[in-house]
Amino acid sequence: MGKEKTHINIVVIGHVDSGKSTTTGHLIYKCGGIDKRTIEKFEKEAAEMGKGSFKYAWVLDKLKAERERGITIDISLWKFETSKYYVTIIDAPGHRDFIKNMITGTSQADCAVLIVAAGVGEFEAGISKNGQTREHALLAYTLGVKQLIVGVNKMDSTEPPYSQKRYEEIVKEVSTYIKKIGYNPDTVAFVPISGWNGDNMLEPSSNMPWFKGWKVTRKDGNASGTTLLEALDCILPPTRPTDKPLRLPLQDVYKIGGIGTVPVGRVETGVLKPGMVVTFAPVNVTTEVKSVEMHHEALSEALPGDNVGFNVKNVSVKDVRRGNVAGDSKNDPPMEAAGFTAQVIILNHPGQISAGYAPVLDCHTAHIACKFAELKEKIDRRSGKKLEDGPKFLKSGDAAIVDMIPGKPMCVESFSDYPPLGRFAVRDMRQTVAVGVIKAVDKKAGGAGKVTKSAQKAQKAK
């Protein structure tokens, strides 16, 4: 078998009709985890519905529909392979909670693939003031997705088809605005593709002899190639934060007969091992970890990215819950946040937001109302420079530094210390009103809290 390939996560962004689904579907279909039988079944259904041309998007529509109906679909369907990586598509917009998911980061994307449509009028619509292209790219950058690939799609529908002039015009325009957001266009691969016909997806296209390939210049190594697949292969692999102290936000807590209390969640930073003494914040409960499991197999250690269940002694299901965070009691244990300072960007709010506004925040797995206690300064969202002190209110499009106070105990961290616990979505009126990153946290020193017998024993034994 040799060494397993590295896993990377990508998010596919772009305007609603840019062809994201077709492009993604094409990759999954050609290099991915969908088996022949499923594809044949889809093709048959597509033909019966008169979608006989079998758009690749159909694959994705089927998967999406299942995901939306809450059927947890086999996640391998959202995977494909390049020569170097196993790639998982964590989400593709168009999914209802896309923005929320992108922020609360069910998992953090290592790279964003921005799809723009080259068709007449289509590109302009996507990039216009209210097109989603800008918002998605800005979000990706704000949330720390620092690598970007741009697929200029639907090259088969330019005027004339496969027009070099049109491609160059789009590259120039996209470069200008991703630069404004904060990306350096020299580090971004631009690829002219047709997700539908397959041009430059996996093999170089004979329809665009003028395209001499893409090149990226970056301090971690330059790269070049022709196809979208090669561009994905040149993503810089992520460094997983094993050296940081443990942070594990709980997704659920189960009570399992004969075993006891089993919290479940994803290790975001650090390492979780049996025998460790962990503290749960904000509830301030400390106990010993008896065992750690993943996919029903016992682990000697769980690393960042692992979704695990772990058995804890002398803790009832009432003591800990979803949204709590587990950490090492001896190494920067997590604590309750009395308040925190954040940089927020208001995405869509019909009115004005002033001090006292108390929407729900989604941060890691926590879902808690927080009050905008003080609007400290309004800033330029591109440069971060201060525009005014103590603004009276904020409206859509504004960026600001604000002080926030949780309505109930919660545990968050600064983005610079623990990125997954330092970004949040602000939800109100059933939509994402704002996104933010936490700059600083005022931690509540809570004394010892509840320390279970097994924790005391384990601590003595050391």
UniProtKB/Swiss-Prot annotation:
Residues with the 5-glutamyl glycerylphosphorylethanolamine modification: E301, E374
EC number(s) reported in the record: 3.6.5.-
Region annotated G4, chain positions: 153-156
InterPro entries: EFTu-like_2, G_TR_CS, GTP-eEF1A_C, P-loop_NTPase, T_Tr_GTP-bd_dom, TRAFAC_GTPase_members, Transl_B-barrel_sf, Transl_elong_EF1A/Init_IF2_C
Annotated segments matching region G1: 14-21
Residue list for modification N,N,N-trimethylglycine: G2
GO biological process, one term: translational elongation
Positions that bind GTP: 14-21, 153-156, 194-196
UniProt entry keywords in alphabetical sequence: Cytoplasm, Elongation factor, GTP-binding, Hydrolase, Methylation, Nucleotide-binding, Phosphoprotein, Protein biosynthesis
Region (G3): 91-94
Keyword Zinc (UniProt): no
Entry-linked Pfam families: GTP-eEF1A_C, GTP_EFTU, GTP_EFTU_D2
Segments forming domain tr-type G: 5-242
Region annotated G2, chain positions: 70-74
Family: Belongs to the TRAFAC class translation factor GTPase superfamily. Classic translation factor GTPase family. EF-Tu/EF-1A subfamily.
Protein name, UniProt field: Elongation factor 1-alpha 1
Organism the protein comes from: Gallus gallus (Chicken)
